[in-house]
Amino acid sequence: MRSHPLWCTFTLVIASACASSAPARRADASSAAEPARYLYVWAGDKDGKSSDFLAVVDVRRDSKDYGQVVTTVPVGMAGSLPHHMEYVLPERGQLLFANGHHHEATFLFDIEDARQPRLVRTISPPSPYRFPHDFARLANGHVLVGYLRSEGASPLPGDTTSPGGHGGIAELDEAGRLIRSASAADSSSKIPVRVYAFALRPGIDRMLTTSAPMMEDTSADVVQIWRMSDFKLLRTLPVPPARLPDGSVVPNGHGYPFEPRVMADGSVLLNAYGCGFYRVTGLESDRAEIRNVHTIDARSAGKRKGACGIPIVVGRYWIMAVGRLSALVTLDVGDPAHPVEVSRLLADSSFHPHWMARDPGSNRIIVGAENGGEDRMLMALVDSVTGRVSWDRSLRAADGAMGISFVRTMWPHGNTGEAFGHAALFRP
C-alpha cells in the first residue's frame, strides 16, 4: 500500500476446510512438522544510508538465542523499501523471491542453509512493466509476478503518475528469467489497473488478480479473471460497495481490492483494503459474479480506509490484519457466502498490523506492521479449533517489550542503526 519511505508500508498453507493456490510445503518440512527454527524478516535500513537486508531470527523456544537476530544478508542497495516476499517458502532447491519497491528490484535468495541464506541475484522488471509487487508460485516452480505499472502515461486524464500505464503480469522461471507476460489493460477501465495479488485455480485454467496501488495516485477498484494457460484476460469486474448488515454503505470500504484466497468450494474470497469482503463465483464460466458478503466496520478510521491487509486462513477461519483498528479480526468462513466474526485481538495503538505468515509446524503467526509499528514484529498464537488468537508473550526484545525489535544500532553486518521490517516467513 501507499507508504512513507521509513514507515513502509500468496498462497498460504491452508488447512483442510479451505483450498488454496499455495504450493506444497518444503521437502524439509515433513508431514510431522516441528516448529520452525528461524524467521526470515525482509528489512530496510531506517535512515536509508546503509544496505537493506534479509534478517534471520532464531525462534526456537529452547535456544539460547531465542528471539535474537543471528544472521543478516545485506543486498547491496539502500533505500529500496523492502516490501513483499513470497507468502510461502518455495520448495527445496528453489530460490526465494522478494521485492524492493523503490528500486523496482526483485531479489532472489538461496535459503538451502536455513541459518545462512545468501543473495544469488537481483533482477529488474521485464519491459514494459514496472514496479513488481506480489509473487505466486506455480506447480512447475515458476513464479507469477504482478506489476503495478507499465511504461507510458496513465489512461486516466489528469493522472500525473509517471510512468502510469496499466499494470500487468509475468511468468518467470526459477532463476528469474522471463517466460511470458501480459497487460492488465482493459478497454472497459479508464482508470489504471494496478495488479496486486493472485488467486490460482489451475484445475479449471483460471486465475484471479486484484488491483491496488502502492505510491500511485489512482487505481481501478476491480478484479480480473484470466485464463492461466495463455494469459488471456477474460473479465474485469468492478468491486461493488461495501455494506453493513443494516444496508448502509461504508465509504471507501470497497477501495483497493487486496488479497484473494481460494475457498474449498472453488469460490474466491478477498478483502479490500477498505475492509469490505467479496466472494467471486463462476470463474470457470462467462458469468462470473462478485458479491459483498461481509464488511468490517472501520469507520472509526475516519475518511481513511480501514487497512485490511494480509490474511491467513487456518481451517475454517480467516484471520485479518486490520491496521486502522490495531487489531487481528477472526472470521469464520466455513460458509464463504456468509462470513461471521468470532473474535478480535487488539495490539497497542502504535502498532498497525498488516503482514502475517503462519508457522506450518506450530500455531504461531508472525505479525508485521504498516504505517506505524514497523520497528517491531509481534508473535501471535492461534487456536485452530475456535479461531481465537492471542499474543505470544514469551518472545521479547532486549528492553522487555513484546516481540522482535529493530530499534538497535548493531547488526551482524555492522553498526548501521535502526531498521524496519515489512514481510516475514518462518523457515523450518
Show the residue positions of the predicted features:
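Structural signature of eukaryotic scaffold interfaces centered on beta-propeller domains
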Residues: A27-P35, H84-R92, F135-A139, S150, ...
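Short, conserved, GDST-rich strand-edge loop motifs in beta-rich repeat architectures
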Residues: E34, V41-G48, V145-G165, T209-V222, ...
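Beta-propeller blade signature
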Residues: A55-V59, T160-G176, A220-D230, M379-S384
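Surface-exposed loop and turn segments in beta-propeller and other repeat-based domains
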Residues: V69-H83, T122-P128, R180-R194, R235-G253, ...
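Loop/turn-rich, solvent-exposed surfaces of beta-rich toroidal or solenoidal domains
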Residues: G302-S384
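Beta-propeller domains
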Residues: I191-L328
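Asp-box/WD-like beta-propeller blade repeats and closely related beta-sheet repeat scaffolds
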Residues: I111, Q116-P202
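Blade-loop segments of beta-propeller domains
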Residues: G67-R137
